[in-house]
Amino acid sequence: MLRGQEERKYSIRKYSIGVVSVLAATMFVVSSHEAQASEKTPTNAAVQKETLNQPGEQGNAITSHQMQSGKQLDDMHKENGKSGTVTEGKDTLQLSKYQSTQNSKTIRTQNDNQVKQDSERQGSKQSHQNNATNNTERQNDQVQNTHHAERNGSQSTTSQSNDVDKSQPSIPAQKVLPNHDKAAPTSTTPPSNDKTAPKSTKAQDATTDKHPNQQDTHQPAHQIIDAKQDDTVRQSEQKPQVGDLSKHIDGQNSPEKPTDKNTDNKQLIKDALQAPKTRSTTNAAADAKKVRPLKANQVQPLNKYPVVFVHGFLGLVGDNAPALYPNYWGGNKFKVIEELRKQGYNVHQASVSAFGSNYDRAVELYYYIKGGRVDYGAAHAAKYGHERYGKTYKGIMPNWEPGKKVHLVGHSMGGQTIRLMEEFLRNGNKEEIAYHKAHGGEISPLFTGGHNNMVASITTLATPHNGSQAADKFGNTEAVRKIMFALNRFMGNKYSNIDLGLTQWGFKQLPNESYIDYIKRVSKSKIWTSDDNAAYDLTLDGSAKLNNMTSMNPNITYTTYTGVSSHTGPLGYENPDLGTFFLMDTTSRIIGHDAREEWRKNDGVVPVISSLHPSNQPFVNVTNDEPATRRGIWQVKPIIQGWDHVDFIGVDFLDFKRKGAELANFYTGIINDLLRVEATESKGTQLKAS
């Protein structure tokens, strides 16, 4: 029996030794594989960190699999590290084989994932190297362009390109150049909301090499719309409307934001001039217009057509302004004419009557541009009782004729004056034509009609297209009219060099005339009871007559800008905002208490509903992020919140909230729109020629 027990112990010992040997061999194999895997595979912490950069579900799947594999390996080590826990050798051997198989699968999976990650990192590294090479080539091109510009006397500067948005230095003076490369149609995306920068492509690099003098600035390129395509797209967006003025008042926000008081205003103005605001086009496809800096020896202005700014009621400009009278266009905040000329733009400020009617002002505007002695017309002079001829203008464009156009920008009453002059150019003056046929003599070319294609665009700023209650209830009252005419009478003395614009009515003392005789003569003038003056033309009835006299020109781009500086009080009436020009407090309250609610919101002098567009003419709402290039329809820009009537021209020296940088942005934005009008016209001419 003892011998049997010894044989049994010997068999168990022999079997145990065999099992231990198998386990030792298995652990050796597993350890060798694990060592190899550790050389090729990062640790669990490294894997998890690497996985954070994996996009989407792929990274999550890799992380989960790696963590599961690591857990299995840890479990295996725990199982192998325990001694005396194996009760049955057969089961232990099977478990070891199973774990070995699972570990082999896990290691293969890890190796496959590692190879895939290495491949992706290699591709990403190659992509970065390609981008770096392209950026280096572009920087070299920019350096070459800079040296080339310096050799030609150019003073423009360059800066390094950004790898994300490819921003390049802004150009103070820009000129639209044609580019015949066609582009595919794109969707409308306002640049102010587009935070995604396009990636550089070989096609873009090729374009840069093809035009080494053209710089791709941070501004959106000028984009031109095919005429047929533009009409189709815009008609589907919004059909022209007539008369429904209340739709403009609500839901339109201010494009301007108050400027930080701590910011250097001069630097802001400089930045605004160097980087004028540009707006993307609707259905923007078509030939992108590049910009080129103005060279030091370049005389050609940036704009093809001269821009003429026309002042409003009480406006005095240039040499005709008294010493203490503020600079009409921009005040001391931003001198519009001076600054735009510095940038290379051909701009002018017209000087017309400050108190005269829209009729007289329109005639004077014509001769300001064309040159010559003002001819108000024989019929008009006989009808109202003032002189037929007025002052003589030198003219800024003596060769002004069909095909040679101008851009017209009018503030307040200036917008009405512009519209009437264009109507006379195109359709003539029926009264003057009839009078000329009946009496013979001379007739001004302005009144004969047939002079189309002489105006490219009409832009109005705070213009009372439909009149103002302030004129009805205040400005055109007998008491106020007497004060205005008395002022003209006083300024007409022989020692005064200021012309308020009523000399055709006799408001100018003759050289050999005493002041007493001059007063007696002027007191007999018909102007005291006439409607041929600004006070009447700004009323609701006077403006309605003008609207009936004028029509839309299908070849002209019309744009309006409107401000609002009033708020609704507890009783539902409009009160002037804090900061509104103090001289407009009374007129703002007169308008704000009108019986018609839709006529109450105002800018201090003009109701919002009147400034949007003439009530009897078609209009379309446009955003600040699209160019105003449509023709034959009023394009109504969003209402500018917080801007009163004189904020458009910056003459309120007490308003520290409105700074010159705002005016710089505003007027450079207008100029950019006018350049787009010219570019669109050039594109249309090319299409017709082809």
Curated annotation (Swiss-Prot):
EC numbers, comma separated: 3.1.1.3
Active site positions: 412 (nucleophile), 603 (charge relay system), 645 (charge relay system)
Reaction equation(s) it catalyzes: a triacylglycerol + H2O = a diacylglycerol + a fatty acid + H(+)
Protein keywords: Calcium, Hydrolase, Lipid degradation, Lipid metabolism, Metal-binding, Secreted, Signal, Zymogen
GO molecular function: metal ion binding; triacylglycerol lipase activity
Compositional bias (Basic and acidic residues): 72-81, 225-237, 257-266
Signal sequence, renumbered to the chain: 1-37
Name of the featured protein: Lipase 2
Native source organism of the sequence: Staphylococcus aureus (strain MSSA476)
Taxon lineage: Bacteria, Bacillati, Bacillota, Bacilli, Bacillales
